Structures are given as C-alpha cells and as structure tokens.
Amino acid sequence: MTQSIDSMSISIYENLISTMIQDIVSREVVHQKQMQSRYPQLKQYSIDPNGNIDINGNTKQQDSSQYFHCKNCGRDVSANRFAAHLQRCLNSRQRR
C-alpha cells in the first residue's frame, strides 16, 4: 500500500511539474510571436564569450579612454575614477 501511495504521489507531482513547464513554454512562445509581429526588425542580443562586445553587438570602449569634466574643481577625470573623485572633491569643499 505504501508503495502505491508513493508511486501515485510521484505521478501527481510529475504531472503538476509537466503542466507548469508546458504553461510557461506556451506563454513564452506566444510572447515571442507577439514581439516579432510588433517589431519585425528586432534583433536578438549578442553573446560574446570573450567579453569584447556588449549585448547590442557593439565593441566595448575602454573606460580609461573616456574623461569627464568635474564642474566642481574644473579637472578632467577618467570615467573609472569619476565617482571616487567626485566624493573627495565634494567632501573637501564642505570642509572649507
């Protein structure tokens, strides 16, 4: 009797999981078809295992090649150091 209850519960569980997976897949298929009909020029995201391109297929720029002008002190600061610079720059201004 225990074995039949166990097999019955496993069968019910597998049936529920299968139904949920089928529901998710069918919803996603309908969603993809709607997106393709609304936006026919829509292109998929690019995946680069080397990390040389972004999700839109464009080559990544080096962060050190971009500079921002700090309006507080007037210096040009590298993009990858701008947040740290701004914090120091604003804190030193408040002390005065």
From Swiss-Prot:
Keyword Zinc-finger applies: yes
Any single GO CC term annotated in Swiss-Prot or TrEMBL for this entry: SAGA complex
Gene3D superfamilies the record matches: 1.10.287.210, Classic Zinc Finger
Zinc finger boundaries on the chain: SGF11-type: 68-89
BP-aspect Gene Ontology terms: chromatin organization; regulation of transcription by RNA polymerase II
Keywords on record: Activator, Chromatin regulator, Metal-binding, Nucleus, Transcription, Transcription regulation, Zinc, Zinc-finger
Cell compartment(s), UniProt: Nucleus
Location, primary (coarse class): nucleus
InterPro entries, per database record: SAGA_su_Sgf11, Sgf11_N
Gene Ontology molecular function: any one: transcription coactivator activity
Chain's role: Functions as a component of the transcription regulatory histone acetylation (HAT) complex SAGA. At the promoters, SAGA is required for recruitment of the basal transcription machinery. It influences RNA polymerase II transcriptional activity through different activities such as TBP interaction and promoter selectivity, interaction with transcription activators, and chromatin modification through histone acetylation and deubiquitination. SAGA acetylates nucleosomal histone H3 to some extent (to form H3K9ac, H3K14ac, H3K18ac and H3K23ac).
Subunit structure: Component of the 1.8 MDa SAGA transcription coactivator-HAT complex. SAGA is built of 5 distinct domains with specialized functions. Within the SAGA complex, SUS1, SGF11, SGF73 and UBP8 form an additional subcomplex of SAGA called the DUB module (deubiquitination module). Interacts directly with SGF73, SUS1 and UBP8.
UniProt-listed HAMAP family: Sgf11 (MF_03047)
Family classification: Belongs to the SGF11 family.
Domain-level remarks: The long N-terminal helix forms part of the 'assembly lobe' of the SAGA deubiquitination module. The C-terminal SGF11-type zinc-finger domain together with the C-terminal catalytic domain of UBP8 forms the 'catalytic lobe' of the SAGA deubiquitination module.
Name of the protein in its database record: SAGA-associated factor 11
Organism: Vanderwaltozyma polyspora (strain ATCC 22028 / DSM 70294 / BCRC 21397 / CBS 2163 / NBRC 10782 / NRRL Y-8283 / UCD 57-17)
